[in-house]
Amino acid sequence: DLSPESTVITEQGALNHFVAQDVTAIKPARLNELLDRLEQDKDICHHVCSQERQDWMEMVLPRADEIWMFLDSSKEPAQVRQSITSLVDSRAWETVKKVLVILHQGTGTITGTAKWLEMFKPHQHFHIHVSEGNDRARLKRYLLGQSLGLVLGGGGARGFAHIGMMKAFDAAGLRFDWFGGTSIGAVMAAWLGQGLAPAEIVTAIRKFFVDSNP
């Protein structure tokens, strides 16, 4: 489980609980009783499904407040959508908030986002480098409603003071998941959102605001 306040519910967990070989052998009333109890005991319940296990997905999908789709970035969006036809055709697809998590094996430049958004029209989307611990930690915080955002103000050259502030945040162990800003604060926020460290931002500032002298 992700935290004491949440739980992860899987088909195998239900089978183990009822000592059953197939989820269709479990009486719906008994399964619903179990799921109701789990949802009452925890603030957040994550029902884990896969396209290969249709019966389980159809049982838990009506309970969903949100649908999170974890998809392989190396696949074509149209191909992926075709493979989840039963989900796309479900009532929940039209009525429930959809979140797209696009998984990347490498750490190179992300491209092709527009195709994914056009094909799935999610309410929110994330790009996750699966080998990056920071990415996984950020996603976990979002799943638990613990994301932390930072918005930086403007002020021309005074905005460079944000660098010192970020050094202090780093020293305190604070990690931010969202960045926003206005004027020079937006520029600084964009660099932070790209993962640049304070020292790298100083180099970028010198290149774009001193050497080139805009």
Identify the residue ranges that each predicted region occupies.
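Walker A/P-loop phosphate-binding motif and the immediately C-terminal alpha-helix
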Residues: 1-22, 139, 184-185
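Residue-level preference for the first positions of well-ordered beta-strands
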Residues: 7, 44-46, 147-149
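Short internal beta-strands
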Residues: 9, 99-103, 178-180
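TRAFAC-class small GTPase G-domain
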Residues: 11-28, 33, 43, 79
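A short acidic, often aromatic-flanked loop/helix-cap motif at beta-alpha or helix-coil junctions
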Residues: 14-18, 108, 130-138
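Conserved catalytic-core segment of NTP-binding enzymes
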Residues: 31-35, 40-41, 45-131
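Extreme N-terminal, non-catalytic leader segments
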Residues: 122-147
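Patatin-like phospholipase
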Residues: 149-151, 156-214
